[in-house]
Amino acid sequence: MSSKKEYVVGIDLGTTNSVIAWMKPDSSVEVIPNAEGARTTPSIVAFSKSGEILVGEPAKRQLILNSDRTIKSIKRKMGTDYKVKIDDKEYSPQEISAFILKKLKKDAEEYLGGEIKRAVITCPAYFNDAQRQATKEAGIIAGFDVLRIINEPTAAALAYGLDRKGKEEKVLVYDLGGGTFDVSILEIGDGVIQVIATSGNNHLGGDDFDQRIIDWLAEEFKKQHGVDLKEDKQALQRLRDAAEKAKIELSSKLETDISLPYITATAEGPLHLEMRLTRSMFESLTRDLVEMTRKPIEQALSDAKLKPEDIDEIILVGGMTRVPMIQNFIKEIFGKEPNKRVNPDEAVAMGAAIQAAILAGEEGAQGKDIVLVDVTPLTLGIEVKGGLFEPIIPRNSTIPIKKSKVFTTAEDGQTEVEIRVFQGERPIAADNILLGSFRLVGIPPAPRGVPQIEVTFDIDSDGIVHVSAKDLGTGKEQTMVVSGRHKLSEEDINKIIEDAKKYEEQDKRRKEEVELKNKADDLAYYIDKSLKEYGDKIPQDEKQKLETLVNDLRDAINKNDIARIKMLFDELEREKTKIGEYIYKQNQGNQQAENQ
């Protein structure tokens, strides 16, 4: 019995469309057509009344007649606890996505005449831990061994990077898909592709452009006939299909005719929609949407510390980038034509296929030693004494990455510590996002500052975060995987970065105040300890003065009286030196007495 040949593939699991590709033994990459003969598969799943599950184009056709049982853009819900309820059964976003992946797998196996087990699947650069985990789970449910989850712009750069040799370049990937916008800046050279900055907006895409055409059509029709087509589900779906078709046509034509006979009916009889949409009208309807991509571009350039003229190449990803207004907009910002050599619909899947072939050691990938370097979008760290945020892995660090810092206890005799993990750019932990917490117990009682607790953050190549805390004295360790309950969109991430800039002065002041309180508390603790140990060597009046100062300082700390803390801290710092002097003098006097 002959066993079937096994293939490895790359998959672009998109919001609107999905694509599957493989690398041939001759190193060329082929996009695999689906059973309908198309190179892209709509990311749509429909449940027919008879219980059949339809995926792709057949499901898209159900949107009109069976809209309540048809699911599109499920990618937006990945990593959430959202459920799709069909009849009495609930489906998670992973399960719906798995139906799409299963179709891609089945159709590709038919086409290649073999078996597909291993795959690299892509996700937006801004997907957080929960969203990446969900993408991986969808792959597993669909029957794949998921070799790696990689960022879409990284994959696009990989598809592009293989045919560039020996030249270091700064590449900007402008990815405007059906539902999301991502911009990434990469460094390509010497077989290394490194993401140096990413930004975007995960609620901006081709769907929004379609919606503008739908609104215009509905408005014009209402003016002509006094009927609101948006009230009619079936009419609205026909408008949506017509809008998408018109948008695509206007990329190559200056005008398009939209004809929808029998769109609706009134008591007088049927009504037909006949309209002409020009490219200039389409541009005036959507110019502000294109303009919305400017800010993320500026943010990415700022993060990468680059100016537009520093960018060597601009790669376009996503069908929307075929729109002439978008290409002109990019040209206006960067002063150069975007590179159109990469097919915008297929680049991501092709890059994923290349990475899959490299990871699987496929024949076509021999000698191709590509290293993908992604970055973490926000700083990760823990809460320390006084509620301060102590960064452990800074924003835009390349992953995979592992970093550790050693901390200690804040109280005498402390036998456990709570490790609270935060993500964000603000110096006060509470202003950042709490990702999770866990306790390390069983620390032997000791004075504060003595135990040594090593906290380690480890981000793997899929961008999944593992945190551990280890008592270096006993070897006891506790770990957690960040579950990523906080689903951050690109807007959330950009807002976090902007807030950090906006509140910079205020945050700096608050941080300085907390640090002063911490230093004051440490000083009070030190003086207290010294008085207990050496009190008999210090004159009574000085001892009383120090005790009063310590009590006053602690009172000021409790009342958060910053001015008083500062004054008492400075005074206690001056008095502190006297303790040493008295101890030294007394010891000297004792030695002289012994020598006589």
UniProtKB/Swiss-Prot annotation:
Signal peptide: none annotated. The modification Phosphothreonine is found at residue 180. It comes from the Bacteria. CDD domains: ASKHA_NBD_HSP70_DnaK-like. Pfam families: HSP70. Keywords: ATP-binding, Chaperone, Nucleotide-binding, Phosphoprotein, Stress response. Induction: By stress conditions e.g. heat shock. GO terms for molecular function: ATP binding; ATP-dependent protein folding chaperone; unfolded protein binding. Belongs to the heat shock protein 70 family. Acts as a chaperone. PANTHER family: HEAT SHOCK PROTEIN 70KDA (PTHR19375). This is Chaperone protein DnaK. It comes from Thermosipho melanesiensis (strain DSM 12029 / CIP 104789 / BI429). The gene is dnaK.
